[in-house]
Amino acid sequence: MKRMYIQAYCQSNLGDDLFVLHLARRYPETEFYLYAVGDNQKAFLSQSNLRLPRAWDRLRRKGRHMLGLGAEPFDGQGLDGTVVIGGSILWEGASLDFSGAPCFLIGPNCETEYSPAFRQRLEQALRNVRSCCFRDRASFEQFSQLPNVTWAPDVLFGYDAALPYQRGCGIGISLVSRKGAFRDDGLREIYCNAIADLCQRCLEEKIPLRLLSFCDTEGDEEMVEAVLTRVSNPASIAVSCYRGDPGTFLAEMNECETIIATRFHAVILGWVLGKNVVPIVYSTKQTRVLADCGFQGPMWNALEAASMTGETLLEYVKSERGRLDIAELKKRSGAQFAALDEYLK
């Protein structure tokens, strides 16, 4: 049995937690080490091949670092390799510390532009890993000259939610409030007002609503509260906050028929669940993936149009043009793991 270290964002973010679970379930005969602590372990406790640090492991790790005794398994050392899995991990200034050879990068995307110095560092880092599979074509094309670089649809297109399609009712709205999600505070305010206006119209038309928070750490729940303070009857709106129980959260999401998706993975999970999806775009990572998918439905691209109303968003919902057959994308997303399959299977 091989032992692998997982380098991932462990802050009870639904998308990132599902990355880790999908990875561990794909390789049940591999033992994975993941440094997630406290409540951030909750999503992984029932996954038998995921090794999580206990209190003693954390103390030992801290002590070894303080005494200069070097790294240990929960740093990725002494194992058979490292899997770095995540989306927006190659930002300008990222550490690019992909240690624990052989190292496999799964599912990242590039920024639109890098400084020449950082681009040079990133290219060298990519040369040194066993493989890197980007989740969009544009990111791949920046480094397509490297033989170990490929691309395939996002990992979560292949996620098995273990939920049959059900004809839901009403609208689920995935919210974000992360610093930097919108280019300025003014656009963030326009966003909040547009969502609140939509909610008010839905209340008046008796359309069921559910606000969705994918990650409290990044401020999604703050935006939920901000929206609720701007509607006349907030008690009539259901709220789902992800706290480390992906099964329950996805089941509640599945009860909706349309997903208005600001979170990147709300778009993909909405399609995985067979829903009508209306994307709200605040980043080029979204526009790239939507283009790769051939999505032709209505969306609010906040990168191009700063204004939006609840009335327009509701028209987008009612157009029922946001569904996408993802069968081929699901199949192709498995290529994210091609190099790792060869190494582990």
Language model features with spans:
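Active-site anion-handling motifs in enzyme catalytic cores
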Residues: 1-345
